[in-house]
């Protein structure tokens, strides 16, 4: 009996290669036990003199995979957080509690495998090594074996994780036919903008379901979010975009609005919350939800909306145990904000899956953007030039020591155009990162030939009749913050009212859904919305259908006439002159928020209310 017991204990403590095991990522059907050995990076004398930190800036580990030695080089991601990073949660009595925790000495790393030029590593060293690395074209996970007192780790291929759900997850963003109508000569003047280093200050919110899902443990959720952002920073480096987490918020008491299965409604309400309630300045905000979204949808975002006061947002479902898969979904939605459409069959990536694939593909983590995505991104940058991306964060809030010559304008620098051999900026002294004598600026929408443009020079044209142009002030290289007409300003020949820089109208929505020849249907068609059936209603809450009141009928299902035979989204459910669209997966075909529904009246949450 004693002999049997000893054998059992040995099997538990020292798992063998090829067995199944339950790990944090799920059930793994084939894995290998490794014992990472730390290799000193600096000579002992330097290690002793070095400032004492809990986590080192650079580390090196060696272990074997399939009998082959692997040397893992790691460097701490010093650009993960902004200097003014904050965290917010809520007390039981409803008080908002915001702190500025120390995050400089964190445990999140990027790296590579020695002698493997195409390798990548994204992991944390908070308690052992945990994360993802790519070696010889294969995707691997590594994580500590919790039930072992030794340094044992499990290494396994991503493909060997037993899938939680075999059904492919899809993105809720629909294809658009947007094309630039700017003249080539005007676009060519914006090439400098495309080449500039860009900063994306990201704010992430975890909803109340997330809080409950992870046992109300704030530390567990924040570590998961940090893993996601660590992944996102890697993939966006390829676009010369530095992503820094500027704030993280947990709705630990209750959600700030009703979050349900409809990504369209959630996205709208989150965008309104961000623009009217959230006080922390940010370039983009993402809502991480534990709610199961409609159908197989894993997220959604507004297309070409980066820096927009209202629409620079996305929503992502926490659909997988792997933080990197959820991080990939968030990187995908941010890509939509940056103008990228879904990849088609003609798009491809050199290393496996592409980030902008319309559905999650289970064979590997996406690590790069396709040529199609790069084309979309470049077009969007050249036509829309989202200014928040080149606004240097306050105090260059990236946590790292300034390095002259890295193209990043950091604290203490007036400019940074690369090394003296690489610099092509006539206003910047490359060796010192200072402006040349007589120069007042080196770049910016209000900088020309090293001088500030005169006050009154237009630096950002109005996008539409609800937007306002911006003009240089004569004392700065930066274009002033984007402004627009006040809400309620009449637009589109009195067909609508401006709302945060946009003019939502029934006519425009019909054209989007049914093509350029479509028009708004006769008023009697909208009376169907009083029926309160599967298709005709004003609001659906938790699958409960609420019919429209007679005064609210133009705030329910959208009815159009003419145009194409089938809609661009959803399925046709009725014919001319009362054409409508419907989809079970998404709440498609409903009248948009703030659309005009009467004189001085607009739609809001399925009701026609006064401005």
Curated annotation (Swiss-Prot):
Motif D/ECD-tripeptide: where in chain: 465-467
Signal peptide stretch: 1-20
Note accompanying the cofactor annotation: Binds 1 zinc ion per subunit.
Domain Peptidase M12B: 198-393
Cross-referenced InterPro entries: ADAM_Cys-rich (IPR006586), Disintegrin_CS (IPR018358), Disintegrin_dom (IPR001762), Disintegrin_dom_sf (IPR036436), MetalloPept_cat_dom_sf (IPR024079), Peptidase_M12B (IPR001590), Peptidase_M12B_N (IPR002870), Reprolysin_adamalysin (IPR034027)
Gene Ontology biological-process entries: proteolysis; venom-mediated fibrinogenolysis in another organism; venom-mediated hemorrhage in another organism; venom-mediated suppression of platelet aggregation
Disintegrin domain mapped to chain residues: 401-487
Keyword vocabulary terms for this entry: Cell adhesion impairing toxin, Disulfide bond, Fibrinogenolytic toxin, Glycoprotein, Hemorrhagic toxin, Hemostasis impairing toxin, Hydrolase, Metal-binding, Metalloprotease, Platelet aggregation inhibiting toxin, Protease, Secreted, Signal, Toxin, Zinc, Zymogen
Glycosylation, residue list: 217, 260, 395, 528
Enzyme Commission number(s) from the entry: 3.4.24.-
Summary of subunit composition and partner proteins: Monomer.
The name this protein goes by in its record: Zinc metalloproteinase-disintegrin-like ohanin
